[in-house]
Amino acid sequence: MFNSIRNFLGFNEPEEYEEYYEGEIDNNDYHALYPAEMPTPLPEESAPAPRRLPENPTVASNFAMNSNTTPTRNNVIGLPGVSNSPAEVVVCEPHSFEEMPQIIQALRDRRSIVLNLNMMDPDEAQRAVDFVAGGTFAIDGHQERIGDSIFLFTPNCVQVTNSLSREETPATPAAPARPAAPAPAWSDEMTPMAQAQ
């Protein structure tokens, strides 16, 4: 049984060997079969050709001009997806799940999203949060719940911190007073009967 599975998977393929002749090979035969390669001479070093400045004025501006040195090219290249423009926060209040792909695209464009789901059905809102959270996870972004059905989703270039400490947090309305617990049916003092034992 095991062999039939191995045969089916191709592990018991009959090995085919090339036929070879045993015998002494003298050195003349070896050199006849494998002639020695002649080493190729190295090209003689020549002086490098002088650099020529481009004739396009916009490209020429990328070259540094200095009277004491030869022209050199400015090799600084900007990172794709990173710009010097200010960060953008998009506030979205979707009415249906069909609007979620646009929110994911905004995250991919490195924009932060404040997602207010108060206008959606609760089941559809949960599905929307799960979808956007998955997209945020896929781009190594961050998510934070900032209110009732309000979420913040940011790309990985934005760090979200809560700068308020517990002492600085504004006082929230006090919870309704709970009724006092009834007095226990037994007292904390030991009864004379318990002391006798």
From Swiss-Prot:
Residues 170-185 have a biased composition (Low complexity). GO terms for biological process: division septum assembly; FtsZ-dependent cytokinesis. It comes from the Bacteria. Pfam families: SepF (PF04472). InterPro entries: Cell_div_SepF, Cell_div_SepF/SepF-rel, SepF-like_sf. This is Cell division protein SepF. It is found in: Cytoplasm. Residues 38-72, 164-197 are annotated as: Disordered. Homodimer. Interacts with FtsZ. Belongs to the SepF family. The gene is sepF. Residues 58-72 have a biased composition (Polar residues). It comes from Picosynechococcus sp. (strain ATCC 27264 / PCC 7002 / PR-6) (Agmenellum quadruplicatum).
